[in-house]
Amino acid sequence: ILIGLVGSEMCIRDRYKVKGIMYMIHSVALIIADFLFSKDAITEEEKEVCAYGMELIISGIISVALVLIIGLITGNIWYAVIYNMMMILIRTYTGGYHADTHAGCNVCYCGVYLISLLMLRIQVYIRETIIITWLIALTGYLIIVLNAPLEHHNKKLTIEQKEKYMIVSAVLGIASMLISFILNIIGVVTRYGKYSFLCQISLYINTMLLIIGLLLLLGVRKEGRFHEEDS
């Protein structure tokens, strides 16, 4: 019984911590919205929308900063930079899985980064890595092309936007693989056939394509459940 009570208390405490983080982000967003309103930059009707937008921006900045900090601590800062760039740039057009709370989003964002590093380490130690990594990249690219863009239930897209996002997603995927291919060649040539840091960057870019694709599939599944409950 005592263990159960302690466990319950810890769950309640964690819940309040999460609410505290969300409240802090919400409070800062409201302050910014009020400031913009006082400067006549937005109207009274736009304050709520502005505050929500600021919440998303602040939460996003926190996520990016946390990944960079983890990258510095673990000595993987370049991977952290690439992770942030690809997650922000490509997922802007593909869409994908999003947590229900800002705290959950931050945890997922950092967790996926750690998973990406683990996947990279596994590939580095596996033989025939070149074949595997390009299969990974191709799989991620096909998932993106076949499923992007994912329309969020709170953010509907017009037909023109869907077509634009689909094309941009495909182009960004091809560009990522092209950059990866070039880095791999340069890495091999500069090290006379031996594996180099540039080759690992190439591996990581391909890994991120698969991760973005898998997050897109998770988002498709989540949106599907939402529409089923809504109907």
Describe these PLM feature segments.
Residues 87-99, 145-154, 220:
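C-terminal ends of transmembrane helices
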Residues 70-85, 131-136:
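Structural signature of hydrophobic alpha-helical transmembrane segments
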